[in-house]
Amino acid sequence: MNDAPKHPLIERILNLELAMFLSVPVLQKAGCQEHPEEFKRTRRAQFLTWSEKTLASYQEDLLQAEAEGRNLMTHKYARMDGLIPKLEDNPLIDRIVEIEYAWQKGMFHRYPRLMGGARPLASAEDSPFQTSFETYLSGELETYSSQTLAALFQDMTQALAEGRSMTEDLYTHLVRSYGYASLEEAEEAAAGNGPIQG
């Protein structure tokens, strides 16, 4: 697949997100705020799995929030920490979380060493020191518009029909950005060097 046409759109999204991310209040600060290039690396890997339609819709979400003086990153982390009520009650959120949870679980089974630094899976594993994948994802999805959620769900439905995991695609992009040829190579390297943090 040729991802080149998506790159300018992704970079615009990353710049919008990073500006919001770096403005998140200190009490909600994430460790990667000290390393913005790592934030962009991880987010870029995620956005490379999205269609241009979904990317364009999310960019519009960011631009609209910016115009209205809303910081979607602040809202996401506030939801993760239970500081504000639910932002969005779209039924697609639960369906997306269910699919991505299964994909993420599959990554833990297939690449346990590589995934050793990843968030715990279930919200039941949340603690004051660590937020689970499930809680993090739900908090992020609640900041998306209905249009973006619908477009993302369409991407995921297509991936399922093709027998693909968008989560595996994400991690493939991520390990390649670190110089590995494949997930298998990164898994082997993780045995000696430790997992990629994510």
Regions found by a protein language model. Name each.
Residues 26-49, 60-61, 72-73, 132-141, ...:
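A cross-kingdom feature marking solvent-exposed beta-strand/loop segments within repeated
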Residues 2-33, 83-84, 90-124, 176-179:
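Polar/charged low-complexity regulatory segments
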Residues 69-84, 166-179:
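Short amphipathic alpha-helical linker/capping segments at the junctions of internal repeats
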